Structure formats: structure tokens, C-alpha cells
């Protein structure tokens, strides 16, 4: 984790640029995050927080942090920017309740293809989720943001949790 911090400290300009990016999503992350975490995917329009989340064929979300005001109506669009079909490189968005174990959830859901990789035994840990989409597809869901706090979101497609979570 600390390996990503020394590089920006060696160069003045990137450090200042990074600082500007960190100010955009108001509260700071408790742990260092990859550069893509700086991508602001939330746009508040009136009473609705619009979230534009992207996933690709490299098993990456375009961010690993989403900040929305507690209780705000959320309209989240997951867009698969890759080309591979859902059967081989499908992605979904699953927002788990506070305290839920993302790894355990993903492991339990690996065989739940018919329910978009959300197993019946762990469905009660989900706040909101999308269906699985393939390359070039997108899906939009609406839900109310939970109480203030930190929540795990992930792609539960088999093998994706390790690199597709935030």
C-alpha cells in the first residue's frame, strides 16, 4: 500500500495534481487507493445522485470509491465498455450492507449464474444490485443510499471480486 505514495512525493507537479483530485470527492479514503479511485463518478442533480460506473474487459471498474449523501436517491448506471460477452466477461454491481464480507459473499455466489451471481443464502446482505451485463451493454438501477458509513461494492461474477471491489 505504501508503495504508491513515494512516487508522487518525488515529483512536485504530480503531487499537487493528485491533491487537487483528492479534494473533489470530499472525505478522504482511510487507506491509499489506486489512481483510478480519483475518478468522480457521481453527479448530484436535484434530489438524485447520478452514478456513472464503468467496467471493462480488463476486470476493472473506473473507480473504487463512490460517495453519495446518506438517504439520497441514487440512479446508478453500470456500463460495460468492453467487447467480451456476459458469458465470459460479465460484470455486475452489488452494494453490500455494512459489515458484510465481500470475499465470503463472492465465494458463496460463484455458482449462482441464474440469479446474476447472487446466491440465495447471501441475498440478505445486498442493499442494491444490477443484473450481469456483457460488452457494450449497460443497466440502470435506482435505490436509496444507506446511512452514512463505509460499504463494500463489488462485481460478483466468478473470479472478479479480487480486483473489482471498492
Residue spans for each PLM region:
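Extracellular/periplasmic metallocenter environments
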Residues: 32-35, 128-166
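Bacterial lipoprotein signal-peptidase II cleavage site
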Residues: 1-11, 21
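N-terminal low-complexity, Pro/Thr/Ser-rich intrinsically disordered segments
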Residues: 17-54
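N-terminal edge beta-strand
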Residues: 43-74
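Extended, low-complexity, turn-rich repeat/linker tracts enriched in Gly/Pro/Ser/Thr and Asp/Glu
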Residues: 82-86
Amino acid at each position: 500500500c505504501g508503495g504508491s505514495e513515494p512516487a508522487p512525493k518525488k515529483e512536485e507537479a504530480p503531487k499537487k495534481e493528485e491533491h487537487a483530485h483528492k479534494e473533489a470527492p470530499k472525505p478522504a479514503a482511510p487507506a491509499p487507493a489506486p489512481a483510478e479511485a480519483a475518478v468522480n463518478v457521481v453527479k448530484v442533480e436535484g434530489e438524485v445522485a447520478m452514478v456513472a460506473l464503468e467496467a471493462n474487459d480488463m476486470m476493472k471498474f473506473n473507480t473504487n470509491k463512490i460517495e453519495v449523501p446518506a438517504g439520497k436517491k441514487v440512479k446508478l448506471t453500470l456500463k460495460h465498455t468492453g467487447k467480451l460477452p456476459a458469458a465470459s466477461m460479465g460484470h455486475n454491481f452489488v452494494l453490500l450492507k455494512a459489515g458484510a464480507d465481500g470475499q465470503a459473499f463472492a465465494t458463496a455466489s460463484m455458482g449462482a449464474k441464474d440469479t446474476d451471481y447472487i446466491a440465495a443464502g447471501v441475498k440478505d446482505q445486498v442493499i442494491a444490485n444490477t443484473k450481469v451485463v456483457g460488452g457494450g451493454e449497460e443497466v440502470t438501477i435506482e435505490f436509496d443510499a444507506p446511512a452514512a458509513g463505509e460499504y463494500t461494492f463489488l462485481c460478483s461474477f466468478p473470479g472478479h471480486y479480487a480486483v473489482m471491489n471498492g
